[in-house]
């Protein structure tokens, strides 16, 4: 069991004491076959390697301070890239891909393609595309990420298990001016107490970035390379996890506050996605609720190979799938209720109490009201209420094929360890002998890559 001081992910990251790597920003101009790429801007010229001085900062970024970098442009990244580019006075966007071959595939593609469920298709190739690597390019312009300066607006939409590792790899280019937003499944690893420990070990006290999270409820399915279908429009929430603690220079307080809020405010103003800006405490609660939904929908649709709506076809308490859902929710409920009543999360609960319920610290009735809020949250995460929310959410995205199902069908690693695995790990951390057998069983079945019907599923889990 991971200790509170040294969870396994933190130990793994901190065991690497090397300086953060210097990364090169490859573009299609750096591909081995220059004839395969045509310049789309006059200032890029021919891609003859002899034309460029070594390490010359040839930048594709207009207004680099405001440029947005989307790291991991999968379904969520493409959704936000597509809609952010439609804003009035839209900021320039760079898509950061994770494989070299995606650069050449981008050149021959139609760009980011987003279809809605009515069949309307939007195509957009007005993005820069880069691959960030320690390997120096042999052809074309040689550029360091951000020309060796700091990244300001970073949107990380990789798989959950890769997100923090990606941010850690980029820390050479992150600092007090940087706003990093994670848009992933699961509960962020950066909540207290682990987040502050990580940040303190990786950044000087006056140079830490701000970290935020975006909880996305939209249903999105992959339909091809750089191509997604917005199957189930919904909403999203964005808020701070860790605010950089830099002490601004004299006379820069106001500017510092504006810079802190700029990127998340910009994201929340993106048209059509209904991304609401919330406080840290609200975000924590929302992430926990979304975790429960994902812990039910993702593995079950994957094992049954079905769309989301098929999980909720029956309300019969004797139905095999209903019995699995009921037990899964009872176990998740018990873990989260215990977490809410654990003092390790006092900072998040305080934020929630003071921003949502307007409690005033130090007031005479603060303690009594705080305890009452804790009781209300315990009820909010009771099994019957979670079940009602699960059914409502699942039926709203009934036509959606879950991200875990899409990963399994494509032969990719799933996020089961960041979803149901989080519930198992938290139960162990709390040390209250909580039953999480259903979640352990789901992890085993997903990692065995089995396909079941609901009767066999119930037999294996109950």
Curated annotation (Swiss-Prot):
Q: Which UniProt keywords apply?
A: Calmodulin-binding, NADP, Oxidoreductase
Q: Which GO terms describe its cellular component?
A: mitochondrion
Question: Which species does this protein come from?
Answer: Beauveria bassiana
Catalytic activity reads: (R)-2-hydroxy-3-methylbutanoate + NADP(+) = 3-methyl-2-oxobutanoate + NADPH + H(+)
| Function of the molecule | Ketoisovalerate reductase; part of the gene cluster that mediates the biosynthesis of beauvericin (BEA), a non-ribosomal cyclic hexadepsipeptide that shows antibiotic, antifungal, insecticidal, and cancer cell antiproliferative and antihaptotactic activity. Ketoisovalerate reductase BEA2 catalyzes the NADPH-specific reduction of ketoisovaleric acid to hydroxyisovalerate, a precursor for beauvericin biosynthesis.
Give start-end positions of Basic and acidic residues composition bias.
38-49
Q: What is this protein called?
A: Ketoisovalerate reductase
- Is-annotated flag, keyword NADP? yes
Enzyme Commission code: 1.2.7.-
């Amino acid at each position: 069991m991971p200790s509170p001081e040294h969870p396994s992910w933190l130990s793994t990251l901190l065991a690497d004491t090397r300086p953060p790597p210097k990364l090169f920003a490859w573009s299609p101009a750096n591909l081995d076959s220059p004839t395969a790429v045509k310049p789309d801007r006059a200032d890029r010229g021919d891609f003859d390697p002899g034309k460029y001085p070594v390490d010359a900062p040839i930048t594709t970024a207009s207004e680099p301070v405001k440029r947005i970098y989307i790291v991991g442009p999968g379904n969520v990244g493409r959704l936000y890239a597509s809609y952010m580019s439609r804003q009035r006075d839209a900021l320039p966007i760079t898509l950061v891909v994770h494989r070299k071959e995606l650069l050449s595939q981008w050149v021959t593609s139609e760009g980011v393609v987003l279809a809605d469920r009515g069949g309307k298709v939007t195509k957009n190739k007005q993005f820069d595309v880069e691959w960030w690597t320690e390997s120096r390019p042999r052809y074309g312009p040689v550029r360091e990420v951000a020309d060796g300066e700091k990244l300001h607006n970073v949107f990380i939409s990789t798989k959950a298990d890769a997100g923090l590792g990606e941010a850690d790899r980029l820390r050479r280019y992150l600092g007090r001016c940087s706003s990093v937003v994670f848009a992933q499944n699961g509960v962020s690893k950066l909540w207290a107490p682990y987040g502050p420990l990580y940040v303190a070990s990786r950044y000087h006290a006056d140079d830490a970035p701000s970290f935020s999270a975006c909880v996305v409820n939209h249903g999105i399915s992959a339909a091809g390379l750089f191509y997604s279908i917005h199957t189930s429009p919904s909403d999203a929430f964005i808020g701070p996890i860790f605010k950089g603690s830099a002490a601004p220079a004299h006379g820069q307080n106001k500017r510092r506050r504006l810079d802190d809020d700029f990127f998340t405010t910009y994201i929340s103003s993106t048209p059509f996605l209904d991304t609401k800006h919330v406080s840290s405490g609200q975000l924590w609660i929302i992430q926990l609720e979304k975790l429960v939904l994902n812990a039910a929908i993702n593995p079950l649709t994957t094992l049954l190979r079905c769309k989301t709506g098929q999980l909720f076809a029956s309300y019969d308490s004797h139905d095999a799938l209903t019995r699995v859902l009921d037990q899964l929710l009872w176990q998740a409920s018990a873990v989260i209720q215990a977490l809410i009543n654990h003092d390790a999360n006092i900072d998040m609960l305080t934020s929630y109490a003071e921003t949502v319920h307007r409690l005033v610290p130090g007031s005479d009735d603060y303690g009594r009201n705080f305890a009452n809020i804790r009781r209300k949250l315990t009820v909010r995460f009771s099994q019957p209420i979670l079940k009602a929310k699960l059914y409502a959410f699942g039926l709203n995205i009934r036509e959606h094929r879950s991200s875990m199902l899409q990963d399994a069908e494509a032969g990719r690693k799933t996020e089961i360890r960041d979803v149901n695995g989080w519930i198992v790990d938290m139960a162990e951390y709390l040390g209250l002998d909580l039953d999480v057998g259903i979640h352990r069983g789901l992890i085993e079945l997903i990692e065995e890559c089995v396909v079941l019907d609901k009767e066999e599923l119930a037999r294996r889990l109950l």
